[in-house]
Amino acid sequence: MANKFPFWAAAISSQQQQPSDPPQQHSLQAPNSRSLLPSRSLTRPAGPTTLGHDLIAAFAEATATPYFIYRLRDAMLASPTGRRILRDRPRITSTSLNLPYLRSLPPGTVGHTYVAWLDREGVSPDTRSAVRYIDDAECAYVMQRYRECHDFYHALTGLPVVREGEVALKAFEFANTLLPMTGLSVFAAATLKRSERRRFGEIYLPWALRNGLRAAEVINMYWEEPLERDVVGS
Protein backbone atom coordinates (compact mmCIF):
# COMPACT_ATOMS: atom_id res chain seq x y z
CA MET A 1 0.00 0.00 0.00
CA ALA A 2 2.33 2.64 -1.32
CA ASN A 3 5.13 3.23 1.19
CA LYS A 4 2.95 4.29 4.06
CA PHE A 5 1.98 2.66 7.31
CA PRO A 6 -0.34 -0.38 6.90
CA PHE A 7 -3.46 0.67 8.76
CA TRP A 8 -3.98 -2.66 10.53
CA ALA A 9 -0.47 -2.87 12.04
CA ALA A 10 -1.38 -1.12 15.28
CA ALA A 11 -4.33 -3.43 15.86
CA ILE A 12 -2.26 -6.54 15.18
CA SER A 13 0.56 -5.48 17.48
CA SER A 14 -1.97 -4.91 20.22
CA GLN A 15 -3.80 -8.06 20.11
CA GLN A 16 -6.36 -12.90 -10.21
CA GLN A 17 -9.84 -12.28 -10.26
CA GLN A 18 -11.47 -11.43 -13.61
CA PRO A 19 -12.69 -7.89 -14.29
CA SER A 20 -16.44 -7.45 -14.10
CA ASP A 21 -18.98 -4.85 -15.00
CA PRO A 22 -19.93 -1.98 -12.67
CA PRO A 23 -23.12 -2.26 -10.61
CA GLN A 24 -26.21 -2.64 -12.79
CA GLN A 25 -28.89 -1.49 -10.33
CA HIS A 26 -28.00 2.17 -10.62
CA SER A 27 -30.95 4.59 -10.72
CA LEU A 28 -30.59 8.00 -12.35
CA GLN A 29 -32.00 10.71 -10.10
CA ALA A 30 -33.08 14.23 -10.85
CA PRO A 31 -31.07 16.71 -8.73
CA ASN A 32 -34.06 17.73 -6.60
CA SER A 33 -34.99 14.07 -6.05
CA ARG A 34 -31.48 13.15 -4.94
CA SER A 35 -31.42 16.01 -2.47
CA LEU A 36 -34.35 14.43 -0.63
CA LEU A 37 -32.58 11.11 -0.08
CA PRO A 38 -30.77 12.06 3.15
CA SER A 39 -33.95 13.23 4.85
CA ARG A 40 -35.93 10.26 3.61
CA SER A 41 -33.35 7.78 4.84
CA LEU A 42 -33.23 9.41 8.26
CA THR A 43 -36.95 9.88 8.79
CA ARG A 44 -38.41 6.76 7.22
CA PRO A 45 -38.85 3.90 9.70
CA ALA A 46 -36.28 1.19 9.14
CA GLY A 47 -38.55 -1.90 9.45
CA PRO A 48 -36.79 -5.05 8.25
CA THR A 49 -33.01 -5.25 8.34
CA THR A 50 -32.68 -5.18 4.56
CA LEU A 51 -34.75 -2.00 4.35
CA GLY A 52 -32.63 -0.38 7.04
CA HIS A 53 -29.47 -1.28 5.14
CA ASP A 54 -30.94 0.08 1.90
CA LEU A 55 -31.81 3.39 3.55
CA ILE A 56 -28.33 3.71 5.04
CA ALA A 57 -26.79 2.92 1.65
CA ALA A 58 -28.97 5.56 -0.04
CA PHE A 59 -28.00 8.12 2.59
CA ALA A 60 -24.31 7.30 2.11
CA GLU A 61 -24.59 7.86 -1.64
CA ALA A 62 -26.56 11.09 -1.30
CA THR A 63 -24.08 12.63 1.13
CA ALA A 64 -21.06 11.51 -0.92
CA THR A 65 -22.08 13.57 -3.94
CA PRO A 66 -21.06 15.76 -5.52
CA TYR A 67 -17.72 16.46 -3.81
CA PHE A 68 -16.60 13.58 -1.62
CA ILE A 69 -16.94 10.66 -4.02
CA TYR A 70 -15.06 12.64 -6.68
CA ARG A 71 -12.29 13.32 -4.17
CA LEU A 72 -12.02 9.58 -3.50
CA ARG A 73 -12.06 8.81 -7.23
CA ASP A 74 -9.29 11.36 -7.77
CA ALA A 75 -7.23 9.70 -5.02
CA MET A 76 -7.48 6.47 -6.99
CA LEU A 77 -6.51 8.19 -10.22
CA ALA A 78 -3.43 9.59 -8.48
CA SER A 79 -2.25 6.09 -7.54
CA PRO A 80 -0.88 3.50 -10.01
CA THR A 81 -2.71 0.75 -8.12
CA GLY A 82 -5.86 2.83 -7.88
CA ARG A 83 -5.80 3.37 -11.63
CA ARG A 84 -5.47 -0.38 -12.18
CA ILE A 85 -8.48 -1.01 -9.94
CA LEU A 86 -10.52 1.55 -11.86
CA ARG A 87 -9.49 -0.04 -15.15
CA ASP A 88 -10.14 -3.65 -14.06
CA ARG A 89 -13.21 -2.90 -11.90
CA PRO A 90 -12.94 -6.12 -9.86
CA ARG A 91 -15.80 -7.10 -7.59
CA ILE A 92 -15.44 -8.72 -4.17
CA THR A 93 -17.88 -11.62 -3.88
CA SER A 94 -17.82 -15.13 -2.44
CA THR A 95 -17.36 -16.46 -5.97
CA SER A 96 -14.70 -14.07 -7.22
CA LEU A 97 -12.59 -14.61 -4.10
CA ASN A 98 -13.10 -18.40 -4.02
CA LEU A 99 -13.76 -18.66 -0.29
CA PRO A 100 -13.07 -22.43 -0.07
CA TYR A 101 -9.58 -21.78 -1.43
CA LEU A 102 -9.02 -18.97 1.07
CA ARG A 103 -9.94 -21.38 3.88
CA SER A 104 -7.15 -23.67 2.68
CA LEU A 105 -4.49 -20.96 2.97
CA PRO A 106 -2.12 -20.99 5.96
CA PRO A 107 -3.28 -19.10 9.07
CA GLY A 108 -1.81 -15.61 9.17
CA THR A 109 -2.19 -14.96 5.46
CA VAL A 110 -4.43 -12.14 4.29
CA GLY A 111 -6.87 -14.51 2.61
CA HIS A 112 -7.19 -16.92 5.53
CA THR A 113 -7.53 -14.05 8.02
CA TYR A 114 -10.30 -12.56 5.89
CA VAL A 115 -12.34 -15.73 5.43
CA ALA A 116 -11.84 -16.79 9.06
CA TRP A 117 -13.32 -13.46 10.13
CA LEU A 118 -16.28 -13.93 7.75
CA ASP A 119 -16.93 -17.40 9.16
CA ARG A 120 -16.57 -16.28 12.77
CA GLU A 121 -18.91 -13.31 12.36
CA GLY A 122 -21.37 -15.15 10.13
CA VAL A 123 -21.25 -12.58 7.33
CA SER A 124 -20.86 -12.80 3.56
CA PRO A 125 -19.25 -10.50 0.96
CA ASP A 126 -22.38 -10.94 -1.15
CA THR A 127 -24.61 -8.77 1.04
CA ARG A 128 -23.33 -5.33 0.05
CA SER A 129 -26.00 -3.09 -1.46
CA ALA A 130 -25.58 -2.13 -5.10
CA VAL A 131 -24.95 1.57 -5.74
CA ARG A 132 -28.08 3.18 -7.18
CA TYR A 133 -27.94 6.94 -6.69
CA ILE A 134 -24.56 8.04 -8.05
CA ASP A 135 -24.91 8.98 -11.71
CA ASP A 136 -21.25 8.94 -12.74
CA ALA A 137 -20.44 5.30 -13.58
CA GLU A 138 -16.82 5.52 -12.42
CA CYS A 139 -17.77 7.16 -9.13
CA ALA A 140 -20.53 4.58 -8.66
CA TYR A 141 -17.88 1.88 -8.93
CA VAL A 142 -15.67 3.69 -6.39
CA MET A 143 -18.53 3.63 -3.88
CA GLN A 144 -19.21 -0.04 -4.62
CA ARG A 145 -15.52 -0.84 -4.15
CA TYR A 146 -15.48 1.02 -0.83
CA ARG A 147 -18.43 -1.04 0.40
CA GLU A 148 -17.01 -4.36 -0.72
CA CYS A 149 -13.61 -3.69 0.90
CA HIS A 150 -15.16 -2.92 4.29
CA ASP A 151 -14.94 -6.49 5.59
CA PHE A 152 -11.22 -6.64 4.83
CA TYR A 153 -10.75 -3.75 7.24
CA HIS A 154 -12.77 -5.61 9.87
CA ALA A 155 -10.79 -8.81 9.37
CA LEU A 156 -7.33 -7.30 9.50
CA THR A 157 -8.06 -5.13 12.54
CA GLY A 158 -10.03 -7.86 14.29
CA LEU A 159 -12.91 -5.47 14.96
CA PRO A 160 -16.22 -7.38 15.24
CA VAL A 161 -19.54 -6.38 13.69
CA VAL A 162 -21.03 -5.33 17.01
CA ARG A 163 -21.79 -1.61 17.44
CA GLU A 164 -18.52 -0.81 19.20
CA GLY A 165 -16.44 -2.40 16.46
CA GLU A 166 -18.49 -0.87 13.67
CA VAL A 167 -18.31 2.65 15.09
CA ALA A 168 -14.55 2.34 15.59
CA LEU A 169 -14.08 1.21 12.01
CA LYS A 170 -16.32 4.00 10.70
CA ALA A 171 -14.13 6.51 12.55
CA PHE A 172 -11.08 5.04 10.83
CA GLU A 173 -12.82 5.16 7.45
CA PHE A 174 -13.82 8.79 7.95
CA ALA A 175 -10.25 9.82 8.76
CA ASN A 176 -9.03 7.97 5.68
CA THR A 177 -11.77 8.57 3.09
CA LEU A 178 -13.65 11.68 4.34
CA LEU A 179 -16.96 10.14 3.23
CA PRO A 180 -19.61 12.00 5.27
CA MET A 181 -21.65 8.92 6.19
CA THR A 182 -18.67 7.37 7.94
CA GLY A 183 -18.20 10.51 10.04
CA LEU A 184 -21.89 10.75 10.90
CA SER A 185 -21.85 7.10 11.94
CA VAL A 186 -19.40 7.94 14.72
CA PHE A 187 -22.24 9.68 16.57
CA ALA A 188 -23.67 6.22 17.15
CA ALA A 189 -21.11 6.01 19.96
CA ALA A 190 -23.66 7.94 22.02
CA THR A 191 -25.86 4.84 22.04
CA LEU A 192 -23.17 2.61 23.53
CA LYS A 193 -23.19 1.53 27.15
CA ARG A 194 -21.24 3.80 29.49
CA SER A 195 -18.32 1.37 29.75
CA GLU A 196 -18.27 0.97 25.97
CA ARG A 197 -18.34 4.74 25.41
CA ARG A 198 -15.42 5.18 27.77
CA ARG A 199 -13.42 2.45 26.04
CA PHE A 200 -14.32 3.92 22.65
CA GLY A 201 -13.19 7.41 23.67
CA GLU A 202 -9.98 6.28 25.34
CA ILE A 203 -8.86 3.51 23.00
CA TYR A 204 -10.78 3.00 19.77
CA LEU A 205 -11.37 6.59 18.65
CA PRO A 206 -7.74 7.72 19.10
CA TRP A 207 -6.57 4.54 17.34
CA ALA A 208 -9.01 5.05 14.47
CA LEU A 209 -8.20 8.71 13.84
CA ARG A 210 -4.46 8.26 14.21
CA ASN A 211 -4.24 5.30 11.85
CA GLY A 212 -6.85 6.57 9.41
CA LEU A 213 -4.82 9.74 8.90
CA ARG A 214 -1.50 7.91 8.94
CA ALA A 215 -2.38 5.18 6.44
CA ALA A 216 -2.27 5.49 2.69
CA GLU A 217 -5.67 5.68 0.97
CA VAL A 218 -7.10 2.23 1.69
CA ILE A 219 -9.33 2.48 -1.38
CA ASN A 220 -6.13 1.94 -3.40
CA MET A 221 -5.46 -1.51 -1.92
CA TYR A 222 -5.92 -4.26 -4.51
CA TRP A 223 -7.10 -6.82 -1.97
CA GLU A 224 -7.33 -9.63 -4.51
CA GLU A 225 -3.54 -9.65 -4.98
CA PRO A 226 -1.96 -10.19 -1.51
CA LEU A 227 -4.35 -12.95 -0.38
CA GLU A 228 -1.55 -15.52 -0.13
CA ARG A 229 0.85 -13.16 1.64
CA ASP A 230 1.40 -12.92 5.36
CA VAL A 231 -0.67 -10.19 7.03
CA VAL A 232 2.27 -8.62 8.85
CA GLY A 233 4.32 -8.40 5.66
CA SER A 234 1.50 -7.02 3.52
Swiss-Prot record:
Pathway: Cofactor biosynthesis; ubiquinone biosynthesis. Zn(2+) binds at H150, D151, H154, E166. Its cofactor is Zn(2+). One of its GO terms (biological process) is ubiquinone biosynthetic process. Residues 13-44 have a biased composition (Low complexity). It is a peripheral membrane protein. Signal peptide: none annotated. GO terms for cellular component: extrinsic component of mitochondrial inner membrane. It is an enzyme of class 4 (lyase). Keywords: Lyase, Membrane, Metal-binding, Mitochondrion, Mitochondrion inner membrane, Ubiquinone biosynthesis, Zinc. It catalyses: a 4-hydroxy-3-methoxy-5-(all-trans-polyprenyl)benzoate + H(+) = a 2-methoxy-6-(all-trans-polyprenyl)phenol + CO2. Residues 12-44 are annotated as: Disordered. InterPro entries: Coq4, Coq4_euk. It is found in: Mitochondrion inner membrane. Its EC number is 4.1.1.130. Belongs to the COQ4 family. Lyase that catalyzes the C1-decarboxylation of 4-hydroxy-3-methoxy-5-(all-trans-polyprenyl)benzoic acid into 2-methoxy-6-(all-trans-polyprenyl)phenol during ubiquinone biosynthesis. HAMAP family: Coq4 (MF_03111). This protein may be expected to contain an N-terminal transit peptide but none has been predicted. Component of a multi-subunit COQ enzyme complex, composed of at least COQ3, COQ4, COQ5, COQ6, COQ7 and COQ9. This is Ubiquinone biosynthesis protein COQ4, mitochondrial. It comes from Chaetomium globosum (strain ATCC 6205 / CBS 148.51 / DSM 1962 / NBRC 6347 / NRRL 1970).
